[in-house]
Design a protein with these regions (language model features):
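Catalytic-core signal marking the mid-to-C-terminal active-site face
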Residues: 1-7, 11-27, 32-35, 40-47, ...
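Short beta-alpha connecting loops at secondary-structure transitions
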Residues: 9-13, 267-273, 301-308, 336-348
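N-terminal small/glycine-rich loop or linker at the start of catalytic domains
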Residues: 20, 27-29, 85-106, 292-303
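Flexible, glycine/charged-enriched surface loops at secondary-structure junctions
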Residues: 38-45, 58-60, 249-255, 293-299, ...
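Glycine-rich, N-terminal phosphate-binding loop and its surrounding beta-alpha-beta segment
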Residues: 42-105
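A glycine-rich phosphate-binding loop feature that marks nucleotide/adenosyl-phosphate handling sites
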Residues: 44-51, 259-264, 301-308, 337-341, ...
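Helix-rich catalytic cores of soluble enzyme domains
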Residues: 108-329
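Ligand/cofactor pocket segment of small-molecule handling proteins
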Residues: 308-352, 356
Length: 404
């Protein structure tokens, strides 16, 4: 634990909220040891089976249970933030929209082209407020997309690597420049390895590529409906990825890219990325990782609007201002995205950049900092690795938190 950062976090978040975050870490460790992570990948299972003799892990019926000492040991071998190539308070273009929004016609659903990708990469390289980028949009050829990003943007990059050819291409890029990350959604919530990508995660780690480990538990669906509950589930899933990476390749760079997300009952329990609460939850996730001295990338500055509107601009300003007020390491999804990250709008990209150039911490709304809610872990113990939509905490908290 970085004690200097603990004190900094206390000064901006308050002592009770920092106490909550430290307990979130303990809760995540409990989840790994008592609920475990379902896994069918033989290589990953093997890494933990080796440790059963020393009581550092248990593998039972294709479920991995990680003991606290092992989790803490693995965290100690992760290179810290000072050794990482992206500075604090970095906003990234991130995410992977399947479509382009036609701002002139006022409709989405256009297929992204090479020209769109080049434009995004050039914009990221040129803008002083954009510190790095993910893909932004999805092209069918992931290798071509990686190469476009590397050619047109010299800033830190992250991209998915979902094939042997993509692994080899990422290795070739990494040999020339070290500021890239291989992104993996290693888990699918709640608490299950995503077998579609686990093979390539193992290969990327063995190749020494920095791994960007994402997880997206949804409060009220796949996680408890309170701040510390969804933070703990998010943290547990990413910690599993970090532990796996450190066992396969001790000392490899890991980026904690878990982003807690909130189901909105007004939207039939779909996520609402425009909530103040979404930004705050991700800022809190960032602070926990800053205190643990782990490179960290969350999600902020988004909107629930389906096109560029006054509300979408207000959402961008609110998210950026909150991040600047409280501090963070890296935030993604901060430029160009519309509702559900489905459409990417160039008009919104340009507007978001203009907002980021002028926004200040003084633009942030007042927020009530959360404190620890014991019912969050009570829900975890009761519901476990099942769905939380009918959980008693979800029903009692509807309309009381995550509402603005």
């Amino acid at each position: 634990m970085n004690q200097e950062q603990v004190e900094k976090s206390k000064s901006v978040l308050g002592e009770d909220t920092v106490k909550m975050l430290l307990q979130v870490h303990e809760d995540a460790i409990w989840i790994l040891g008592n609920l475990g992570i379902g896994c069918n990948n033989l290589e990953i299972l093997k890494q933990f089976q080796i440790l059963e003799e020393d009581n550092q892990a248990i593998v039972y019926e294709n479920r991995i249970y990680i003991m606290p000492d092992l989790a803490e040991r693995c965290l100690k071998t992760v290179p810290g933030i000072a050794e990482f190539f992206a500075p604090r308070n970095s906003f990234f273009i991130g995410g992977t929209a399947p479509y382009i929004y036609d701002d002139a016609a006022g409709e989405g659903g256009l297929s992204p082209s090479l020209g769109h990708m080049i434009r995004i990469a050039k914009t990221a390289e040129k803008s002083k407020v954009i510190a790095g980028m993910g893909k932004g949009v999805k092209l069918k050829n992931e290798i071509l997309q990686m190469n476009i990003m590397a050619e047109y943007c010299g800033k830190p990059l992250y991209f998915n690597v979902n094939s042997d050819a993509a692994i080899e291409n990422a290795k070739a890029i990494y040999a020339k420049r070290k500021n890239i990350m291989a992104m993996f959604n290693l888990t699918r919530s709640p608490l299950q390895v995503n077998e579609n990508v686990s093979e390539y995660f193992v290969k990327a780690v063995k190749a020494g590529l920095p791994v960007f480990i994402s997880a997206m538990p949804l409060a009220g669906v796949s996680a408890p409906y309170c701040y510390n509950g969804v933070l703990a589930m998010t943290h547990a899933e990413v910690l599993f990825g970090i532990c796996t990476a450190q066992l396969l390749h001790p000392g490899i760079t890991c980026i904690h890219a878990g982003y807690p997300t909130i189901a909105d009952p007004r939207l039939d329990y779909h996520p609402n990325f425009g909530l103040i609460s979404h930004n705050l939850a991700n800022i809190l996730m960032a602070h926990l990782n800053l205190m643990l001295d782990i490179p960290t990338c969350q999600s902020a500055g988004m909107t629930h609007e389906a096109k560029l509107t006054e509300r979408s601009m207000a959402d961008t300003r609110m998210g950026h201002a909150l991040c600047l007020k409280y501090g963070f390491h890296i935030m993604r999804h901060s430029f160009g995205f519309l509702r559900y990250l489905t459409d990417f709008s160039f008009a919104k990209l340009d507007t978001d950049i203009s907002i980021a150039e002028t926004v200040t911490p003084a633009d942030a709304p007042e927020v009530e900092m959360p404190v620890y809610d014991e019912r969050g872990m009570a829900s975890v113990r009761q519901t476990g690795a099942n769905m939380y939509k009918e959980d008693s905490l979800t029903t009692v908290n509807l309309g009381k938190i995550f509402v603005s």
